[in-house]
Design a protein with these regions (language model features):
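Non-catalytic, surface beta->alpha helical segment in thiol-disulfide oxidoreductase systems
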Residues: 72-90
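Thiol-based oxidoreductase modules, predominantly thioredoxin-like and allied folds used
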Residues: 4-8, 26, 37-63, 70
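Short active-site neighborhood of thiol/selenol oxidoreductases, capturing the structured segment around
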Residues: 17-27
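Short, proline-centered helix/strand-breaking motifs
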Residues: 21, 39, 74-76
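Substrate-binding pocket helix/loop in short-chain dehydrogenase/reductase
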Residues: 11
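Short cysteine clusters
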Residues: 31-34
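Conserved beta-strand positions that form and line the central face of beta-propeller blades
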Residues: 5, 22, 87
């Protein structure tokens, strides 16, 4: 399965209400490290069926990115039962 693009319309359903843990990739197209990480995130999405892998474009939803306290990118966040469990910056 490929990574799911998260937008305003599907955030609650795909992230907060997901039955599986969610690996959320906060990125921007202009971010060099994000572009390097992107293929790895896509590979994880293909290989793992126990976690939903999603991509979150920070420029499209800056308020929601701020809600997650994303100050720099890339950020990978693990969401379980609608709550932030862990995150890795950089």
């Amino acid at each position: 399965m490929s990574a799911i693009k998260i937008g305003k319309e599907n955030f609650a359903n795909e992230v907060l209400n997901s039955k599986k843990p969610v690996l959320l990739d906060f990125f921007a197209v202009w971010c060099g490290p994000c572009r390097m990480l992107g293929p790895i995130v896509s590979e994880i999405a293909k290989e793992r069926n126990d976690v939903n892998v999603s991509k979150f474009h920070v420029d499209e939803q800056p308020k929601r990115a701020a809600w997650f306290q994303v100050m720099s990118i890339p950020v990978l966040a693990l969401i379980k039962n609608g709550k932030l469990e862990n995150r890795v910056v950089g």
